[in-house]
Amino acid sequence: DVYKRQDETLKGQYRGIRQGTCFAHSHYSGLSKLFVKQSTDAPLMTASEVWFLRAEAALRGWTDEDEETCYQNGVTTSFHQWGIYGVEDYLQSERKASDFIDTYDEENNIEARCKVSPKWNPLDDKETKLEKIITQKWIAMFPEGCEAWAEQRRTGYPLSLIHISEPTR
């Protein structure tokens, strides 16, 4: 079982499975009661999602709002929703996604596709700005997996790792 494997070299590190790798669903998944009852405590739409929708609308010229302000409000609202501190530093960060390194099989290593940082740059082209907005929206949508998936299918963002089993996706 991949999750119960003990390896002292990985102690204290995040262990995850890259999208597209092949594992039987019985190794990692079960149907949650959350998905089979009539009501839910899960958010259907959050204030941060609304801010990101407004940022996208402004970027596309559908409103007179300032896309940078809406973008920053979206990130800030998401941080506040989840009780996370440091939003000011995050919004100034120029850090980008790291490459994926598989410590067990280097054939799975892959360069990060997402090349945008959280910091807004008014000189970026429209597509880069859209990538920033949607990438942050996707992060803020936790735990709305289905909505985040639909957003990624709609826009192509965030640029995630290529699925090993579906290289043409």
Language-model features and meaning:
Residues 152-161, 165:
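An amphipathic alpha-helical core segment
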Residues 1-54, 59-60, 65-123, 128-130, ...:
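Hydrophobic-face positions in mid-chain alpha helices that act as interaction patches
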Residues 139-154:
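Bilobed periplasmic-binding protein-like "clamshell/Venus-flytrap" ligand-binding domains
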Residues 2-3, 166-168:
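Short, small-residue-biased leader/transition segments that mark boundaries at the very start
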